[in-house]
Amino acid sequence: MPHIPVPAAELNTRLDRLRCAMTEKDPAWSMLLLDNTLDMYYFTGTMQDGALVVTPDQATLFVRRSFDVAKDESAFADIRPMGSFRGIKEVYPDIPETVYVAAKAMTLQKLSMLNKHLPFAPKPMDGVLSGLRSVKSAYELDCMRESGRLHRYVIEGLAPAFLREGVSEARLCSEICTAIVDRGGMGISRYNQPAAEDVLGIASFSENSLRPTALDSPSGCVGTSTAMKSIGSSERTLHEGDTILLDIPCGWRGYHTDKSITFYYGELDKHPQSGVIRAAREQCITLENETASLLRAG
């Protein structure tokens, strides 16, 4: 059931942790304002056009669009409709000189719109936000584990059956992602970067998997066009002897797992470099296991 709301207790705990972290950062802090949808979802369980205002003793989600949807899907305690940012000042008449914001996500245009009604100097709180989100609650870990279970089932269990002579990169990627969405997946993944959303992922065959992209990733892709370096080519089709790189994430209720996997299409023993390919695979497995052994809390 992917549409189950984030529990109220979970949202309350996050708000308490936010206030504690802000007090540790600045004992004199008096207000913070978050306007981007990712922060809004984390603290309120809904993604709307609006702003979340938090003080040491009060928190209000102001929603321009859509207030009705926000009330329907969020367990956040105080959600109010907002015509413009002037509405914030009606609830919080004493706007402090300094207000903490997510500087990485707030645009100059949005800041100008806010300052038209709320004259304040912005101060960044990005470190606080990333620190809070880096420590997962039991609820968040459960979401990630469910994403991982779904991810593994589709990528490792179903994907090999989708490999067939003549299928294009784009078609293969879309079929795999459809299988994820059909089973409750989000159909999108998000990164901690401005405007960083990936609708599907990538499927790349042989030489295309070595094609560099602007994304901070080792996976290569020619994309659907020069304007879209993702998903894969609708022209490059699969043939015997190709390698298939799948770098397709999975999301569940706002939480993600990421995995890359490479398949070989055909009889590997017939490939002139079969020994090199097998050795490369074993080396990858060794590196993966060594890396996993280094992981520890903190």
Segments predicted by a language model, with ranges:
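Active-site neighborhoods and metal-handling regions in enzymes and metal-associated proteins
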Residues: 1-298
